């Protein structure tokens, strides 16, 4: 049942891909009896021409071109949504692990003289889905920093600057960000929400201010990343808590609508 619930959450992600506005929000709903649903918006600035792909176990993969790349064989089957057909932005594997990439302009992956094996940013999500069943497993392995991220520009010349959110069927969650070439990991079931700029530690600080005020008193209402973070953080816990999969998915849809950017709207000086 939990796998079906997570699959429904992936559908939430896929159906929200074609919006516009350079903004994304991810939220994890944790209801009674282990009910877990992960949803996200994809309010990108242009059509991503998203396709869904189903991958079986046992696929041999490479982290990029050349010889000095990460190589692995997928342990788990998965389904993923690919933007521009160049990489999986959102996906879920057969164990209920969900991974979501969101834009973070503060990201920087480079270290001077770094000769570790390469993992392309476009396959980072798939690497996680292929290899791990739980957030704990992903955190334990990724914190070893065995590879370096290669991040070529996206179509249109946009620099690839992304952070990764991972959640599992138990409701656990982790955020992975590269700042100044170093991996930062934030691991807790309490980290249910992720948006864009600023980096996650600063988002938590801003959200702490709004928690003191209280969501029933006032919530910030713009499409800026920190405002969406505060709204999603309040609503994902304030909404009805249910073990009914259909109601839970509908509830996540309602939260996602509250942070979706209207079509064609963006903030020129703060698009993320």
Predicted regions located by residue number:
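Positively charged n-region of N-terminal signal peptides that target proteins for export
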Residues: 1-6
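Bacterial N-terminal signal peptides
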Residues: 7-18
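C-terminus-biased signal that marks the final domain/tail of proteins
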Residues: 21-37, 51, 61-62, 150-152, ...
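A contiguous strand-loop segment
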Residues: 23-116, 149
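Short acidic-glycine loop/turn motifs at beta-strand connectors
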Residues: 30-33, 93-95, 168-171, 177-182
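Short helix/loop capping segments that flank catalytic or ligand/cofactor-binding pockets
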Residues: 47-48, 108-110, 174-177, 184-187
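Proteins synthesized as precursors that undergo proteolytic processing into mature forms
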Residues: 115-151, 245-255
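Aromatic- and glycine-enriched pocket-lining scaffold segments that form the walls
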Residues: 135, 139-176
């Amino acid at each position: 049942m939990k796998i079906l619930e997570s699959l429904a959450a992936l559908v939430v992600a896929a159906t929200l891909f074609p919006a516009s506005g350079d903004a994304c929000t991810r939220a994890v709903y944790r209801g009674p009896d282990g009910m877990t649903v992960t949803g996200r918006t994809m309010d990108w600035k242009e059509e991503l021409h998203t396709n869904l792909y189903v991958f079986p176990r046992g696929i041999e993969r490479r982290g990029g071109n050349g010889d000095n790349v990460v190589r692995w064989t997928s342990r788990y089957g998965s389904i993923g949504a690919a933007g521009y057909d160049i990489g999986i932005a959102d996906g879920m594997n057969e164990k209920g692990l969900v991974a979501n990439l969101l834009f973070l302009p503060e990201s920087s992956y480079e270290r001077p003289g770094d000769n570790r094996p390469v993992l392309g940013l476009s396959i980072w999500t798939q690497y996680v889905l292929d290899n791990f069943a739980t957030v704990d497993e992903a955190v334990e392995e990724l914190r070893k920093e065995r590879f370096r991220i290669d991040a070529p520009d996206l179509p249109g010349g946009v620099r690839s600057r992304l952070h990764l959110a991972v959640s599992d069927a138990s409701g656990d969650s982790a955020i992975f960000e590269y700042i100044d070439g170093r991996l930062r990991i934030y691991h807790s079931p309490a980290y249910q929400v992720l948006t864009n700029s600023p980096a996650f530690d600063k988002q938590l600080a801003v959200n702490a201010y709004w928690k003191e005020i209280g969501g029933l008193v006032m919530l910030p209402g713009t499409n800026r990343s920190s405002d969406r973070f505060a709204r999603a953080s309040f609503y994902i816990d304030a909404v009805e808590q249910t073990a009914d999969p259909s109601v839970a998915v509908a509830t996540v849809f309602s939260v996602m609508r509250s942070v979706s950017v209207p079509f064609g709207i963006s903030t020129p000086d703060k698009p993320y």
